[in-house]
UniProtKB/Swiss-Prot annotation:
This protein's encoding gene: matK
Role of this protein: Usually encoded in the trnK tRNA gene intron. Probably assists in splicing its own and other chloroplast group II introns.
GO cellular component terms listed in the entry, alphabetical order: chloroplast
Main location: plastid
Record-given protein name: Maturase K
Any one Pfam family match given in the protein's UniProt record, by short name: MatK_N
């Protein structure tokens, strides 16, 4: 117990961070604006205005904001006259946006310094490749194809706003900054939108997405802290892909010790911990869903389920219902993760063996991790975006009157290429042809509606130039490398390509499966 205590302490310099004065520095908000201009070049899927950066930010507006922040009467909350003394962000929407962006940049400073130290200690090269969403799927192909049980885990959300603030207090012991954050969040009445993206208002999900992601990632680290601790205790047995995202939190050791008493109910922690060791256990998470796969028994997975539920409820006051953790056999269950439907597929390898005058036919089943595109949810997303109806029939999309034909073609073509680029890892490309057909015909109907013409006449006038806009990047690359005969074969539809430049999930594939 004494050995693990030292490994769970954080650097003392992190505990002495004084971040509050940075809220009144102009260069912080200038840095936020510059970051918004630069981030557009690295993210090819979302426009800059959807990432929460305002082009209208200026030095004058920042100076006025800082001046109002120095005036204490703007931040006083009066019980007798609450309507007149409300926080200034209710009067000025741009102030709320600038403060939320400044919050994120300032609070990210300690975590950024710790992340740099981790990368230097572990000597991780090409860290940008690990950021890719597609980097998870090769890991799944290599690691979990031989595992038996899979647990789909929906990470619980905090029942009160104060839990989020206390989470940051464990990592950033700067009381003025956290009090400012607490007051700032309480003034925004829709605080549930921080945790549940479904109920998030359009204002917070678009204009303040960076602050939402920071708070949510801090919350998720709370839920994953048990895996970080087990990784420390038995690193040669337990493998955690999420380890290293954040450092250990202050007082975490005391909570783990309390957990041993409440949940395990044994004094000898090392013997109790040995019960949970599994050399073939792997953990993967993206957004609010995680996967815990193991080669052990169903009884072991049930123990893990109970262990996680008590861990979240007793130590962090996170309510976790039993149906949020589902245990399934991997061979009979498909994983819905990041817009893909992944499953195990049995490929049979027939081998002919000859021994003297006798022949033997050996049928060898081989498990293969397979990922396909769930076409029905994807069509549902297209219908929600007004590209088609619920049955998949293409419809014309409302456009601005001043939009040119080239702008419309470029927009539809970019959406088609992005979807094809994201789903390049699917083993069944034919399912994407229906999506391309919907987008192509929806574009034709939109242009025909604009010119008050029929679709047939419009397609006849455009000819092959219209089809070139929907030629995907993968088809262009493969056409230069492979022969036309190979591209026309059935095998070309099964080729999977994982890209390491995809760091954001497309909104059209960011759906959730429903039972």
């Amino acid at each position: 117990m004494e050995e693990s205590h030292g490994s769970l302490e954080i650097d003392g310099s992190t505990q002495q961070d004084l971040l509050y004065p940075l809220f009144f520095q102009e260069y912080i908000y200038a840095f936020v604006h510059d970051h918004g201009l630069n981030v557009n070049g690295s993210i090819i899927y979302e426009p800059m205005e959807n990432l929460g950066y305002d082009k209208k930010s200026s030095s004058l507006s920042v100076k006025r904001l800082i001046s109002r922040m120095h005036q204490q009467n703007h931040f006083l909350f009066s019980v007798n006259d609450s309507k007149q003394n409300r926080f200034v962000v209710h009067k000025n929407r741009s102030d709320f946006q600038m403060i939320s962006q400044g919050f994120t940049v300032i609070l990210e400073i300690p975590f950024s310094l710790q992340k740099v130290n981790i990368l230097e200690e572990k000597k991780i090269e090409k860290f940008h490749n690990l950021r890719s969403i597609h980097a998870i799927f090769p890991f799944l192909e290599d690691k979990i194809s031989h595992l038996i049980y899979v647990s789909d885990i929906l990470i619980p959300y905090p029942v009160h706003l104060e839990i989020l603030v206390q989470t940051l207090y464990c990592c950033i012991q700067d009381a003025p900054s956290l009090h400012f954050l607490r007051f700032f969040l309480q003034e925004y009445r829709n605080w549930n939108s921080f945790i549940t993206p479904k109920r998030a208002s359009s204002f917070f999900s678009k204009e303040n997405q960076r602050l939402f992601l920071f708070l949510y990632n801090s919350h998720v680290y709370i839920c994953e802290s048990i895996f970080v601790f087990l990784h420390k205790q038995c690193s040669h047995h337990f493998r955690s892909t999420s380890f290293g995202a954040f450092l250990e939190r202050t007082l975490f050791y005391g909570k783990i010790e309390h957990l041993v008493v409440v949940v395990v109910l044994r004094n000898d922690f090392q013997k109790s911990l040995g019960f949970y060791k599994d050399p073939f256990m792997h953990y993967v998470r993206y957004q609010g869903k995680s996967i815990l796969a193991a080669k052990g028994t169903h009884f072991l997975m049930k123990k893990w389920k109970t262990h996680l539920m008590h861990f979240w409820q007793c130590n962090f006051h996170l309510w976790a219902q039993p149906d949020r953790i589902r245990i399934n056999q991997f061979s009979k269950h498909s994983l819905d993760l990041m817009g893909y439907l992944s499953r195990l597929r049995l490929n049979r390898l027939v081998v002919r063996n000859q021994m003297l005058e006798h022949f033997f036919i050996i049928d060898i089943p081989i498990k293969k991790f397979d990922s396909i595109v769930p076409i029905l949810p994807l069509i549902g997303s297209l219908a929600k975006a007004k590209f088609c109806n619920v049955s998949g029939h293409p419809i014309s999309k409302p456009i601005r009157a001043d939009s040119s034909d080239s702008d419309i073609l470029d927009r539809f073509g970019r959406i088609c290429r992005n979807l094809s680029h994201y789903h390049s890892g699917s083993s069944k490309k034919k399912s994407l042809y229906r999506v391309k057909y919907i987008l192509r015909l929806s574009c034709a109907r939109t242009l025909a509606r604009k010119h008050k013409s029929t679709v047939r006449a419009f397609l006849k006038r455009l000819g092959s130039e219209f089809l070139e806009e929907f030629l995907t990047e993968e088809e262009q690359v493969l056409s230069l490398i492979l022969s036309k005969t190979y591209l026309a074969s059935h095998r070309s539809h099964k080729e999977r390509i994982w890209y390491l430049d995809i760091i954001r999930i497309n909104d059209l594939v960011n759906f959730e499966f429903k039972d």
